Design a protein with these regions (language model features):
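Hydrophobic alpha-helical segments and their helix-loop junctions in multi-pass secondary transporters
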Residues: 259-298, 303, 312-321, 536-549, ...
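Membrane-interface "cap" regions at the ends of multi-pass membrane proteins
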Residues: 2-57, 259, 334, 341-355, ...
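C-terminal membrane-solvent junction of multi-pass transporters and transport-like membrane proteins
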Residues: 247-257, 466, 470, 476, ...
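Flexible loop linkers connecting adjacent transmembrane helices
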Residues: 20-25, 60-64, 86-112, 133-150, ...
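Membrane-water interface regions at transmembrane-helix termini and the short interhelical loops
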Residues: 215, 234-257, 268-275, 502-517, ...
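Hydrophobic transmembrane alpha-helices that form the core helical bundles
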Residues: 95, 110-156, 202-217, 229-233, ...
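Juxtamembrane transmembrane-helix boundary signature
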Residues: 47, 74-103, 114-130, 459
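Loop-to-transmembrane helix boundary motifs in multi-pass membrane proteins
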Residues: 152-154, 221-231, 415-422, 472-509, ...
Length: 590
């Protein structure tokens, strides 16, 4: 049996070990003994819950619906990349008890406000709240089906519109645009093309037909979904505010919901997934470098969203350091937890972290902690994400595509926004000859989707508030005893909720302002891809240059982090330039 490590007075850690730079020095304490990895399960389940609601349920089934498995290799690569990133985030917290962002702020005080902006702006878009509310509305009220307009520039209309097309086709002379409204049958597409042989008219028709094909010409809207979303945001706020120990509540809720999701997904998978879908997925995983066809209708932002949200994405990954600290990983045991000022006994929370003397005993404990953290994260995060991604993408492929890999007849009508989820639910229902059984499984699919999006909504609000409170307390209000970390957390939580409600209210009341969940998710994904590139570089420097050599990043993980920075940086810049900026300009009349 190993001997207990010797006790040390709470002395300051010298700069020769870990430079304190812009914050007070760390203090010495012994590294606690590491438990078995199964006792550490929790933080990575929360992180996986954050991933389930966007990448697993929305983006990758959407990409699969649009283009099959041609891009699925990037899905597997994205999850693996985030696995390595998350463990580098955990490394600093295990060794110091501080969040990774506090480590960044030791490098420069300016990183405090930069990280605060990067933690608030990408996550304020309420895509998960609107997504969950849309599914809940569909479950209760059905879809509000509306025709969509597709238009293209046309200088003049030189032929008359035949009677059979007049209800859907018109020419706007003032705007000089040819406009088609609603769905389009193959016969109508041929009739439209044969109207006029002029090249400009043919170009306009080709543009319109392509746009109708991408969306189906219909929008499956949801009744009252903005107001339902506001109610869910308020519900999450109340649940978190009244939790005696916030982390315990989040872990319990996420574990229950993730378990429920897995049971439903596996059940649906057994009943629905076709063998040809499995073979197509395996082929796609080895199709390294394959990209969706140009006519698939997939925007660059959707691809980036799928990559960023193959895991949790953005600063949510940084929230892993806050989760493991509250769970008591490593030196986080000495920090304290966030408790409710209303229902819990407020715990003292250390302003700065701790480190350990590098004695043989403490180094043995460090190796035990690092091994246990890696195993826990592999099973709780990596495998959870991979299995759920595969199941939900396979379900999408089996419902929408045939053995030849092509969309089944009529499936184009679900191409707009979140409509493909409405399509999935109704196709699930059609798999069963008994109407009662089919309706039950349709409802089960919606319940799974609501649970997936709600887990993400809960996790995003909690993690964003944790990270922001940590930044402000450590860097701005460290000497202010009135503003404890717990009080800051709850104030920021409700500010986030109010901002999200304001965006939803604008979507409900302001003409032209879109509340489409997929648009919100794309904006968040594009921003978070760039955020991951930036903090990836900071993690590299922190764990390579600031961390003591015996605890620092290894060569293999160094290569993985360099790859992650380049990967997310490239795709983010492209998405922002090509799609985010034009979308924002159109919203605000630019």
């Amino acid at each position: 049996m190993s001997q207990p490590a010797p006790e040390f007075a709470e002395e300051l850690v010298p700069d020769s070990v870990i430079p304190h730079q812009t914050l007070p020095p760390l203090r010495y304490r012994d590294l606690p003994e590491a438990p078995h990895w199964r006792k550490l399960v929790g933080p990575s389940i929360i992180l996986a819950g954050l991933a389930l609601g966007s990448g697993e349920f929305v983006f990758w089934p959407y990409v699969t619906y649009k283009s099959g498995f041609v891009f699925f290799w990037a899905c597997m690569l994205g999850v693996l990349t985030q696995f390595f990133m998350n463990l580098e985030i955990e490394r600093w917290t295990l060794a110091t008890g501080e969040s990774a962002i506090t480590g960044f702020c030791r490098l420069s005080r300016h990183w405090a406000w930069v990280m605060l902006i990067m933690n608030v702006v990408p996550w304020v878009w309420p895509g998960w709240a609107t997504g969950a509310s849309m599914l809940l509305s569909w479950t209760m009220f059905g879809a509000d089906i509306k025709p969509l307009e597709a238009s293209a520039p046309l200088t003049q209309m030189t032929v008359s519109i035949p009677a059979e097309l007049q209800t859907q086709l018109r020419f706007d002379g003032s705007e000089k645009r040819l406009i088609w409204k609603g769905a389009q049958t193959p016969e109508q597409a041929v009739a439209l093309k044969n109207l006029d042989a002029e090249p400009e008219f043919q170009q306009a028709v080709a543009t319109i037909t392509a746009r109708v094909r991408r969306t189906g010409g219909l929008k499956h809207d949801a009744w009252y979904f903005q107001w339902i979303a506001i109610a869910t945001l308020l519900l999450v706020g109340v649940v978190l505010t009244t939790s005696p120990v916030v982390y315990n509540t989040v872990e319990a809720l996420q574990s229950y919901l993730v378990g429920l999701i897995f049971v439903i997904a596996i059940t649906l998978g057994i009943l629905i997934i076709k063998p040809y879908a499995v073979w197509a997925m395996l082929a796609g995983m080895w199709n390294i470098g394959g990209l969706p066809a140009a006519d698939s209708g997939l925007e660059f932002m959707a691809l980036l969203g799928a990559l960023a949200f193959a895991g949790a994405g953005g600063t949510m990954n940084l929230g892993q350091s806050n989760f493991i600290r509250d769970k008591g990983y490593g030196m986080g045991k000495y920090i304290g937890r966030i408790t409710s000022p209303l229902t819990g006994n407020e715990e003292p929370i250390a302003d700065v972290g701790f480190h350990f003397h590098h004695t043989p005993e403490n180094m043995r404990r460090w190796r035990d902690w690092w091994r246990a953290a890696n195993i826990e994260h592999f099973f709780s995060f990596y495998l959870t994400c991979v299995v759920s991604l595969m199941l939900l993408a396979l379900i999408s492929y089996s419902l929408f595509r045939g053995p030849d890999g092509q969309l089944l007849p009529g499936m184009e009508r679900f191409g707009g926004g979140m409509d493909f989820i409405w399509g999935e639910a109704n196709l699930v229902q059609s798999q069963f000859s008994n109407p009662l059984v089919g309706n039950a499984f349709r409802s089960l699919f919606f319940v799974m989707g609501i649970a997936l999006l709600f887990t993400t909504e809960l996790g995003v609000l909690d993690a964003a508030a944790r990270i922001s409170a940590d930044i402000i307390k450590i860097n701005v209000l460290r000497e202010n005893p009135q503003w404890t970390l717990a009080r800051l957390y709850f104030v920021i939580l409700w500010i986030e909720i109010i901002l999200s409600i304001a965006i939803l209210a604008a979507g409900a009341l302001v003409p032209g302002f879109s509340s489409e969940p997929l648009n919100f998710l794309k904006i968040s994904a594009a921003m978070n891809g760039m955020v991951m590139c930036i903090y990836g570089m900071l993690l590299l420097y922190l764990n390579l240059k600031i961390m003591p050599r015996s605890l620092a990043i290894t060569p293999l993980r160094f290569v993985a982090m360099v790859w992650a920075c380049a990967f997310f940086g490239y795709f983010s810049l492209q998405a922002i330039q090509l799609e985010v900026w034009p979308m924002l300009k159109s919203w605000f009349g630019g």
